[in-house]
């Protein structure tokens, strides 16, 4: 099975000395895992930052086994925020949420678009407020249409950090009690780290 697509890097883990297993959310195929040979080399690893947009060629001899990615960089979003700890942590947290909450090999145009929108939100002055609604929109796309928006809107009319943190906590509590725990999923550490960068 061979195909080409474009997608956002959700995660990467070392496979062996020279290779990585990467997980991407692609435009046409949804969430896909594959091995990147040479993924630890200086040439490639610099643009294998979580959140970056990549062109990918996928090759697999057997549908039941993990395939191989050949990748090229399309947009290096993440390096723009190397000097902004909060936004960098936000990207990692958002990509991890998508990794945890989406099913393998199920395309979803709305998820793909919402990932693209994340990088537009990060350019805004009130990015944190908009990010809270980004998380709500993500949950809504995944079938969790919460009336939580009513509470969050009231909570964050004032653009101060305390109320924004309360908004994030409210969404996090819902995520934990309604989605993660019933499915035996752990609360993502990356989201806790993101919240800690804001305090």
Predicted regions and their residues:
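Non-catalytic alpha-helical scaffolds and adjoining flexible linkers that form interface surfaces
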Residues: 1-20, 25-199
